[in-house]
Amino acid sequence: MFIFIMNQLFCDKKDGKMNKDFSALNKMMQDNLKKQTTFSDGIKNLLQLRNNLMEEIDLIFQTTSQEDFFALPFPKSKGNTNATIAWSIYHIFRIEDIVCNSVINNKTQIFFENDFQNRMNSSIISTGNELSNEQMIEFSKVLNIQELYNYAKLVKENSEKMMLELSFEQTKSKIPEEKKEYLRTLKVADDWLIDYWCGKNIRGLLQMPFSRHWIMHVEACLKIKGKLHLKK
């Protein structure tokens, strides 16, 4: 059964069906969010996209060995595959936690509120963008994978609660300029990333990082896993 699941997983990725499905739902969601009359459909499609992607993340956790979580099979890649699976999943949800709670809202990040730095045994509190390949591997080796999964689930749940409470008018709101300085004091993201987030309105943030960012890194994880699978 395990072999069948793995073969099916990698066949789907190879023929591009999954990319196409994610892309279509993502485009529909983006179009829906632009109009008040279709806004609620946009939120539904966003939640559906995230659930579909979370199913892939769940499968990764269920079928990946501890060693494969910190493997780096594409060290020369210039794209998102130049990463470990552990780092990629941490990165997805760390960014989402920061954006949901510190950029859009004025709340304590789940990472800090629930002591996930200690629970995950994380050597960093940031998004991880600053790590070299060697640092990324070392970071991933000591990360508590079960607590990483717990963090991902809590962040997803928290973000989706916010999404369901948003109105169409609220999504037009720009991030206040003064938020930049506050975010810098947290020391959780590079300046260029803070500038990027604060240059968006809430609708723009729903599109990235709450959806497209997931697609980019989940698909990278699946390619990493596929490469590791072929080596065995």
Task: Show the residue positions of the predicted features.
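Acidic/histidine-rich alpha-helical segments that form the ligand environment
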Residues: 123-174, 205-211
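An acidic intrinsically disordered interaction segment
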Residues: 47-59, 174-187
